[in-house]
């Protein structure tokens, strides 16, 4: 695309249209006419350059255009922006592609022809101070012309794809083949009227299992997709109608003026408008790790997806969505993230081991049944041999083998606990959905599991332990504490207004003289600006007109201060202002001013008194901020000059109060009871940090005197690695810390065997968030870089939500253990019953359809029932579960063995002795065994709800899902036994037989209660056995 295309819009014409109204002719702004004239002159220049012919060719091929209309000022209800120009309306007659390649292809020549960033903004009916109009109609027109800021996502699996995946299981395929063979032989032997039952029954059973699995997977997939969309919906700061506001990244449109600060991710392609020391990390696009400085001359382009690492600025959006370089790359990505979580990987190993046992049993059963069948030992209900050795035919041999093979394969299907991965998916999906309701958005699935094993939490103070509702409660000018600003010299007040109102990333917007001002920015900036507006008082608009910002040094956690250089519009005098941590700023001051405006030398005694003022504020849990300034002699003309921060004049201090959250003390107590150490890592003064830690309950009066409990960052940095390892467990508070200190603290804790969770909100917290086992970013104050580096986003910035996430992490692990115990009980009982019965009687008590039904209720229904339990209070009264802890605990082995032994004993007794006397037939007896076995699993679901506690009914009334699944299972079992007799191979039972089945199943409750009275060692059984073997060998 030629440069002309950008100006005339790929054959589109820029046509200034004027109003014909004469009533407003007298006050039409001249700048609007000047803009229209500049557009026309630009077109004439392009004619002279000889490029219009190419543009005309494009115009003939594509006659659509963008039309910029300059309206009368009175026609718009938007006030003029600070750039002195009235907003212009943006009208689009057709699709436009003028700006799509400007940033993607880095067309600097076209950028210059358009007049730089301001020219691009003007063509897009926008401006640095006013932005776009931003009403619904304007946004809709821009979306229609340039598209929306969204990327195509890989199409999620449809329901039938899930069905297909479920049917792709090799053992289900074998069963389908066996069903087809059985159907063919059945029809051949018994005719189509009676011969289709067995084959079709197996077909239906297999498809039912696949359908239920598909429904579950499909619903969980949709839930995960919804959570993924929520995690991608970040808020972006834009200027619309001369007001700064937050909009969804999906609502950013071409022409929007985006405000960028440290930690932001650039939401779309755009060009630089204005700013100071703006640097971005383009490694996501180019792979280069070094920051790139962005300015209006050398590097004006900002690509979607890059991260701001320093400074701040504004950009005008030129392309969105798939028209950006990032969007083009995202369009090519179609692979879904299917990486298993650590728990899923461990469960796959367990499933594989159990599957091998099942296959071995199935092979033995096949061998035994084959031998008994072809020796004539297997007989039907009338006592006749199923295989007649005297009349051997191919059909008889093949049919017999298929039937036996079908039963053996069914044993494998039942034995392999395929419900374990489903249970993990279900409990993760359920937990993630509930966690979002409780303000914890999970970005990585593995974090859900890992939170259950956390032993140490390194948390920030501001906004996490405190309310983040800062307010100035103390004000000092030098060593004086005036009652109000009226008692302070006017020159000092003017300098304080400059320091508070212009050395800031916040903003003050006053829509009219009646409404209160709207203040935006970080909580600290908002508190300082509110104080300046209300107390000094400060006129933000007048201040911006009187002073021009020459240079800015943004605040970062290393310097703990920010600076700005201002030039007075009237006199040309240049002043440097600094604001930041009081002791840091005071250390660079040599002079201070009093309330009377007189400057005094800062001697040793006076410095000590001012330090005491700072300490008194800190001891009162106040954050102390100092203001200082310096007259710049050289005028700050050098482009690369740093703002001088030596020999400053102290203006004063303000103390900001940020109260602790009312619920944080109980949350920290809960962590202590749960065996989790809470460590506060803050950049605040050590006295402030200690006071807040005592208020929150992180340290007590006794702890305060212990060595290393409260430490400053520089002390920790000065230690050797061995010294750090020796003290790291004792640390409860680290004050005046740097992001590097937090990173090292996490590393040392992990070296000591801790599972570490870290909270963070700044860009510099990203390394610690990534290093931690679980990184938790703040959703309100956290930067986008911090959120991208984290595993969980705390949506309300509240420490109590961190504890909630820990509780849910433990619940995930606990629910999985419940299901493992339940399913292995079914697996063991089914394998032993079928194997023993096959060896001793030559037949299996449960048919293929019955076994598939058992597989359905234990794999899917059981997972649904047990994977949706909510956290209990008892979870936070036990120590964390180690990452290396076995999935099956000693208590689970105890419960499993007791229940499986009971089921095997009672069902084998039914198999051998029968029920109901001599009148009961073999089919009725098989139905009793099937019915009792299924009901045993239903009753055992209640036992599985609690692994340690004897009261298995605690809180069951609150779990409607569990009760619903139990009710549905019982209802379907009644249907299977009483109505689908042909399909299930059952016989209708009488009331007495049903009562007997329920009684047999109900005995599992007292057995479960009694067996939990038997103590088991904490140490895993396999470790005890291994240790004993080693001792025997050594002796």
Curated annotation (Swiss-Prot):
Name the SMART domains on file.
Cation_ATPase_N
Which residues does the entry place in the Extracellular compartment?
188-194, 370-395, 840-845, 911-919, 982-990
Q: Where are the transmembrane segments?
A: 167-187, 195-215, 349-369, 396-416, 819-839, 846-866, 888-910, 920-940, 961-981, 991-1011
* Cytoplasmic face of the membrane: 1-166, 216-348, 417-818, 867-887, 941-960, 1012-1035
Q: How might one describe the regulation of this protein's activity?
A: Activated by calmodulin.
**What is the documented function of this protein?**
This magnesium-dependent enzyme catalyzes the hydrolysis of ATP coupled with the translocation of calcium from the cytosol out of the cell, into the endoplasmic reticulum, or into organelles. Involved in salt stress tolerance.
Stated name of the protein:
Calcium-transporting ATPase 7, plasma membrane-type
């Amino acid at each position: 695309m030629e440069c002309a295309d950008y100006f005339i819009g790929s054959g589109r014409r820029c046509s200034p249209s004027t109003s014909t109204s004469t009533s407003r002719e007298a006050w039409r702004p001249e700048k609007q006419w000047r803009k229209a004239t500049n557009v026309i002159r630009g077109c004439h220049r392009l004619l002279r350059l000889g490029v219009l012919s190419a543009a005309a060719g494009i115009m003939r091929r594509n006659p659509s255009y963008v039309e910029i209309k300059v309206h009368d000022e009175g026609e718009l209800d938007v006030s003029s922006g600070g750039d002195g120009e009235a907003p212009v309306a943006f009208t689009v007659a057709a699709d436009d592609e003028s700006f799509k390649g400007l940033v993607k292809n880095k067309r600097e020549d076209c950028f210059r022809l358009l007049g730089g960033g301001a020219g691009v903004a003007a063509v897009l009916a926008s401006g640095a101070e006013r932005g776009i109009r931003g009403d619904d109609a304007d946004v809709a027109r821009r979306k229609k012309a340039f598209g929306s800021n969204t990327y195509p996502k890989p199409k999620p699996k449809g329901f039938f794809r899930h069905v297909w995946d479920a049917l792709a299981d090799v053992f289900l395929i074998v069963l389908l083949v066996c069903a087809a063979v059985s159907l063919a032989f059945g029809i051949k032997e018994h005719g189509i009227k009676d011969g289709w039952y067995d084959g079709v029954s197996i077909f239906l059973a297999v498809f039912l299992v696949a359908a239920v699995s598909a429904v579950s997977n499909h619903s969980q997939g949709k839930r995960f997709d919804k959570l993924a969309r929520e995690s991608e919906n970040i808020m972006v700061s834009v200027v619309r109608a001369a007001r700064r506001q937050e909009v969804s990244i999906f609502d950013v449109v071409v022409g929007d003026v985006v405000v960028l600060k440290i930690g932001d991710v650039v939401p779309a392609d755009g060009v630089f408008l204005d700013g100071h020391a703006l640097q971005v990390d383009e490694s996501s696009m180019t792979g280069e790790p070094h920051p790139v400085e962005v300015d209006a001359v050398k590097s004006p382009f900002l690509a979607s997806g890059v991260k701001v690492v320093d400074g701040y600025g504004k950009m005008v959006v030129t392309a969105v969505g798939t028209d950006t370089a990032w969007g083009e790359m995202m369009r090519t990505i179609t692979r879904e993230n299917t990486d298993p979580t650590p728990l899923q990987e461990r469960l796959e190993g367990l499933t594989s081991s159990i599957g091998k046992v099942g296959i071995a049993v199935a092979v033995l059963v096949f061998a035994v049944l084959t031998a008994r069948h072809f020796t004539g030992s297997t007989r039907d209900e009338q006592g006749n041999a199923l295989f007649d050795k005297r009349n051997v035919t191919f059909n008889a041999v093949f049919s017999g083998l298929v039937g036996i093979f079908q039963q053996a394969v069914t044993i494998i299907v039942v034995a392999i606990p395929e419900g374990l991965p489903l249970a993990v998916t279900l409990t993760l999906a359920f937990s993630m959905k509930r966690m979002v309701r409780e303000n914890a958005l999970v970005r990585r699935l593995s974090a859900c599991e890992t939170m259950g094993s956390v032993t140490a939490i390194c948390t920030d103070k501001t906004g996490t332990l405190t309310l983040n509702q800062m307010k100035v409660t103390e004000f000092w000018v030098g060593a004086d504490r005036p009652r109000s600003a009226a008692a302070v010299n006017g020159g000092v007040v003017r300098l304080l207004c400059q320091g508070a109102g212009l050395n800031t990333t916040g903003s003050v917007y006053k829509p009219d003289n009646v409404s209160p001002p709207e203040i935006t920015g970080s909580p600290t900036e908002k508190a300082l600006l509110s104080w300046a507006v209300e107390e000094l008082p400060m006129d933000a608009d007048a201040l911006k007109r009187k002073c021009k910002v020459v240079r800015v040094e943004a605040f970062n956690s290393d310097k703990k201060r920010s600076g700005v250089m201002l030039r007075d519009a009237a006199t040309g005098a240049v002043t440097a202002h600094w604001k930041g941590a009081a002791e840091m700023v005071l250390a660079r001051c040599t002079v201070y001013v009093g309330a009377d405006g007189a400057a005094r030398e800062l001697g040793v005694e006076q410095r000590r008194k001012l330090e005491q003022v700072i300490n008194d504020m800190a001891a009162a849990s106040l954050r102390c901020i100092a203001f200082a300034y310096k007259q710049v002699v050289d005028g700050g003309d050098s482009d690369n000059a740093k703002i001088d921060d030596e020999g400053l004049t102290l203006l004063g201090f303000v103390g900001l109060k940020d109260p602790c959250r009312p619920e944080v003390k109980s949350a920290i107590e809960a962590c202590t009871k749960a065996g989790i150490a809470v460590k506060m890592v803050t950049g605040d003064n050590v006295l402030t940090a200690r006071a807040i830690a005592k208020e929150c309950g992180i340290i007590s009066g006794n702890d305060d005197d212990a060595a290393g409990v409260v430490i400053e960052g520089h002390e920790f940095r000065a230690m050797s690695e061995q010294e750090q390892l020796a003290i790291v467990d004792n640390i409860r508070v680290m004050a005046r810390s740097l992001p590097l200190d937090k990173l090292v603290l996490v590393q040392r804790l992990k070296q000591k065997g801790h599972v570490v969770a870290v909270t963070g909100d700044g860009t510099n917290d990203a390394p610690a968030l990534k290093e931690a086992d679980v990184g938790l970013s703040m959703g309100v104050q956290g930067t986008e870089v911090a959120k991208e580096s984290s595993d969980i986003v705390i949506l309300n910035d509240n420490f109590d939500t961190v504890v909630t996430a820990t509780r849910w992490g433990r619940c995930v692990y606990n629910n999985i253990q419940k299901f493992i115990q339940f399913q292995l009980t079914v697996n063991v009982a089914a394998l032993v019953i079928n194997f023993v019965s096959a060896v001793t009687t030559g037949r299996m008590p449960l048919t293929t359809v019955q076994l598939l039904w058992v597989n359905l209720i234990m794999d899917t229904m059981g997972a649904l029932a047990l994977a949706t339990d909510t956290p209990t209070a008892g979870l936070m009264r036990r120590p964390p579960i180690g990452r290396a802890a076995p999935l099956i605990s000693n208590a689970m082995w105890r419960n499993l063995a007791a229940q499986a032994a009971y089921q095997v004993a009672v069902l084998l007794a039914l198999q051998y002795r029968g029920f109901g006397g001599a009148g009961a037939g073999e089919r009725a007896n098989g139905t009793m065994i099937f019915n009792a076995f299924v009901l045993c699993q239903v009753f055992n679901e209640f036992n599985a709800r609690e692994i340690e506690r004897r009261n298995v009914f605690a809180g069951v009334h609150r779990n409607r899902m569990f009760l619903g699944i139990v009710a549905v299972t019982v209802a379907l079992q009644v249907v299977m036994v009483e109505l689908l007799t042909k399909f299930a191979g059952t016989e209708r039972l009488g009331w007495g037989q049903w009562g007997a089945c329920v009684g047999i199943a109900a005995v599992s409750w007292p057995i479960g209660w009694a067996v939990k009275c038997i103590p088991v060692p904490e140490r895993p059984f396999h470790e005890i056995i291994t240790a004993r073997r080693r001792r025997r060998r050594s002796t």
